[in-house]
């Protein structure tokens, strides 16, 4: 689960990190009034969406009057912002963040992630702030400095100082950096973060460190014990199909291909997507119906897949271990009848009661294409999606 920038900065302030004074506003009038509360003669206005690249898309602007703030808010509130990180439809803008203007002498990067390889939280810092960390990692990885946090002792001030020396900070800035580092480490653990970025962490003209932006991702598996984080949830920023799938305990991720995939098991689902690609097709989604799939969930899975207008064919790939293939077959038949599937459906069943499942499909009287193997299924569904 991701947070908006204004929510991230609210947490930063609670943990004693230096952030700009700002207000998240729902209306143009409220945005203009926020400028009066902040004071000064120059402000920054930012659209609040769960995506990067806002500046290049026109979603961030430096303004010098309340009229400009109003115009910006009127232009964006209720509309969708399209960036390189969104799909073609973009993300809806429901809030505008109005902030005081901060002078910038230099831009740094500071972030943290859960590193699966070392099984630890790893902090990353770089002198190359203001650009994508992925780009830095690819082009100049030597400019990224890391500090692994030992889970037994937690973050230590000496680790912050080591990073600070590599960033070229002076003694005054070093003290500030240690405070920021320790605050972020505590916040990361307290709130069950999966990702944290301050990009950029700026050095002002006065030589002070300041958190100019904030990006936070919460570990979805920990939301149950984080009521405060759960309250930050903004469903408008999620794909409607993914949100609907979650209600049925279906793991669904929308993609941009034409072959809908319904599979039980995440590993098999990824393998199915790979083999569809191998045979010249493009998956329209990742969908894991799980080990406890029943007729109702299979039916909902079909509805979700077919709600994507790009889907030209559907591949159902089921390995019957916990779940019985004949039950899945009945679910497929019920779903096809209920939903009124108009695209070709290719089904491959293996495992518990696979023969019985195939027999059920064969006797259904529906136009369902049976596949003998995964390769056969991929070949048939790609051909069907291409209208062959």
Curated annotation (Swiss-Prot):
User: Which PROSITE patterns does the entry link to?
Assistant: ATP_GRASP (PS50975), SUCCINYL_COA_LIG_3 (PS01217)
Cofactor, how bound (note): Binds 1 Mg(2+) ion per subunit.
Query: What keyword terms does UniProt attach to this protein?
Result: ATP-binding, Ligase, Magnesium, Metal-binding, Nucleotide-binding, Tricarboxylic acid cycle
Q: Name one GO biological process term.
A: tricarboxylic acid cycle
| Pathway terms, separated by semicolons | Carbohydrate metabolism; tricarboxylic acid cycle; succinate from succinyl-CoA (ligase route): step 1/1
Domain of life of the source:
Bacteria
Q: Where does substrate bind?
A: 264, 321-323
User: Top-level EC class, please?
Assistant: ligase
GO molecular-function annotation terms?
A: ATP binding; magnesium ion binding; succinate-CoA ligase (ADP-forming) activity; succinate-CoA ligase (GDP-forming) activity
Necessary cofactors: Mg(2+)
How would you summarize the oligomeric state and partners of this protein? Heterotetramer of two alpha and two beta subunits.
Disulphide linkage map: none
Q: Which gene encodes it?
A: sucC
Give the InterPro entries listed for this entry: ATP-grasp (IPR011761), ATP-grasp_succ-CoA_synth-type (IPR013650), ATP_grasp_subdomain_1 (IPR013815), Succ-CoA_synthase_bsu_CS (IPR017866), SUCC_ACL_C (IPR005811), Succ_CoA_ligase-like_bsu (IPR005809), Succinyl-CoA_synth-like (IPR016102)
What name does the UniProt record give this protein? Succinate--CoA ligase [ADP-forming] subunit beta
Q: What does this protein's UniProt record list under function?
A: Succinyl-CoA synthetase functions in the citric acid cycle (TCA), coupling the hydrolysis of succinyl-CoA to the synthesis of either ATP or GTP and thus represents the only step of substrate-level phosphorylation in the TCA. The beta subunit provides nucleotide specificity of the enzyme and binds the substrate succinate, while the binding sites for coenzyme A and phosphate are found in the alpha subunit.
Q: Could you say which EC number(s) this protein's record lists?
A: 6.2.1.5
Is Nucleotide-binding there in the keyword field?
yes
Positions of ATP binding: 46, 53-55, 99, 102, 107
What this protein catalyses is: succinate + ATP + CoA = succinyl-CoA + ADP + phosphate; GTP + succinate + CoA = succinyl-CoA + GDP + phosphate
Q: Which GO terms describe its cellular component?
A: cytosol; succinate-CoA ligase complex
Q: Where is the ATP-grasp domain?
A: 9-244
The record lists Mg(2+) as bound by 199, 213
């Amino acid at each position: 689960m991701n947070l908006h920038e204004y929510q991230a900065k609210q947490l930063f302030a609670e943990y004693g990190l230096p952030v700009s004074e700002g207000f998240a506003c729902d209306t143009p009038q409220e945005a203009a009034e926020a400028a009066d509360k902040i004071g000064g003669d120059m402000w920054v206005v930012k659209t609040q969406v769960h995506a990067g690249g806002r500046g290049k898309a026109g979603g961030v602007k430096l303004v010098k009057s309340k009229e400009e703030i109003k115009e910006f808010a009127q232009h964006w509130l209720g509309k969708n912002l399209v960036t390189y990180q969104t799909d073609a439809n973009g993300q809806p803008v429901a809030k505008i963040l109005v902030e005081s203007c901060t002078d910038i002498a230099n831009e740094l990067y500071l972030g943290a992630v859960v590193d699966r390889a070392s099984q630890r939280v790893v902090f990353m810092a770089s002198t190359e702030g203001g650009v994508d960390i992925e780009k830095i990692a690819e082009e100049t990885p030597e400019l990224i400095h890391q500090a692994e946090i030992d889970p037994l002792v937690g973050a230590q001030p000496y680790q912050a100082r080591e990073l600070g020396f590599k960033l070229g900070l002076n003694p005054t800035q070093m003290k500030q950096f240690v405070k920021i580092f320790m605050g972020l480490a505590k916040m990361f653990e307290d709130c069950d973060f999966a990702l944290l970025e301050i990009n950029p962490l700026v050095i002002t003209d006065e030589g002070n460190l300041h958190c100019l932006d904030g990006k936070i991702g919460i570990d979805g598996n920990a939301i149950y014990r984080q009521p405060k984080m759960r309250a930050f949830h903004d469903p408008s920023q999620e794909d409607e199909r993914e949100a609907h799938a979650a209600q049925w305990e279906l793991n669904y991720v929308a993609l941009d291909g034409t072959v809908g995939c319904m599979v039980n098991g995440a590993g098999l689902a990824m393998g199915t997507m790979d083999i569809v690609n191998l045979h010249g097709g493009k998956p329209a989604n990742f969908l894991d119906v799980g080990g406890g799939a029943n007729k109702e969930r299979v039916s909902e899975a079909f509805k979700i897949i077919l709600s994507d207008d790009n889907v030209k064919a559907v591949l159902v790939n089921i390995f019957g271990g916990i779940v019985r293939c004949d039950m899945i077959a009945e679910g497929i038949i019920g779903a096809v009848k209920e939903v009124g599937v108009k695209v070709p459906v290719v089904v491959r069943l293996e495992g518990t009661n696979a023969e019985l499942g195939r027999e059920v499909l064969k006797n259904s009287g529906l136009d369902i294409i049976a596949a003998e193997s995964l390769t056969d299924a991929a070949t048939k569904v790609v051909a069907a999606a291409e209208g062959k």
